[in-house]
């Protein structure tokens, strides 16, 4: 007799595979968040890059979005912020520039072209942001080489690794879109935020202390974080 798999089993398998694939991508993301970038003094890095010193700053926000990778200067240190910025820029340009507006109205083919443009802009922004981050590390005396040919070579490698990390994260998000449960970028952002949950609780506690002590800074910072978070979710 021919044996057939019951429909409910087939349906269950079809539903569970995307979930397992998404979890696998999240594991890869967390592994990349601990891979150290070369040519950095890890001992100096731990003493200088202290997230507790970044409270109420944009650095704290970036560290949260990267799942703590920013403070450790790892492969995914820049997180997915270059892609988010690129998406925002392209969406605004689609309204302001007629050729891009027409492209956005061309259906699936137009969306693929806009997605390709967004990727290129992401790499460009990644290089810019990686360069800025490198100089931050250089000024913090975290880099191993600070003069001569070694300085230039290590600078290029570090910047390219940071940029490559952003490109890999963008690719991981697209894999979740294609083979996982969808919303890949949002899921990676969520995974990073969950990894930083203890730090977030600590930051919220500091905000609360500011409010209890009568500081008006609390009433500015909390809405700012909410607006930034909602903007990211809406764009992605």
Roles of regions detected by a PLM:
Residues 1-102, 109-236:
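N-terminal cationic and glycine-rich segments that engage phosphates or anionic surfaces
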């Amino acid at each position: 007799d021919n044996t057939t798999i019951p429909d409910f089993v087939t349906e269950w398998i079809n539903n569970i595979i995307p979930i397992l694939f998404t979890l696998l991508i999240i594991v890869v993301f967390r592994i990349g968040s601990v891979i150290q970038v070369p040519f950095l003094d890890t001992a100096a890095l731990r003493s200088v890059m202290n997230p507790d010193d970044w409270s109420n700053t944009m650095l704290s926000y970036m560290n949260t979005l990267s799942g703590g990778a920013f403070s450790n200067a790892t492969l995914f240190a820049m997180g997915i912020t270059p892609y988010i910025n690129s998406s925002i820029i392209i969406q605004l340009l689609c309204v302001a520039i007629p050729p891009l507006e027409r492209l956005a109205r061309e259906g699936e083919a137009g969306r693929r072209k806009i997605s390709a443009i967004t990727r290129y802009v992401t790499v460009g922004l990644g290089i810019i942001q990686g360069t800025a981050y490198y100089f931050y590390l250089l000024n913090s005396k975290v880099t191993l080489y600070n003069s001569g040919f070694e300085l230039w070579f290590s600078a290029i490698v570090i910047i390219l690794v940071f940029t490559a990390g952003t490109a890999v994260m963008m690719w991981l998000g697209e894999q979740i879109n294609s083979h996982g449960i969808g919303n890949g970028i949002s899921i990676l952002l969520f995974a990073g935020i969950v990894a930083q949950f203890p730090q977030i609780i600590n930051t919220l506690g500091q905000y609360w202390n500011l409010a209890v002590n009568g500081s008006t800074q609390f009433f500015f910072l909390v809405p700012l974080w909410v607006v930034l978070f909602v903007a990211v979710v809406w764009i992605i």
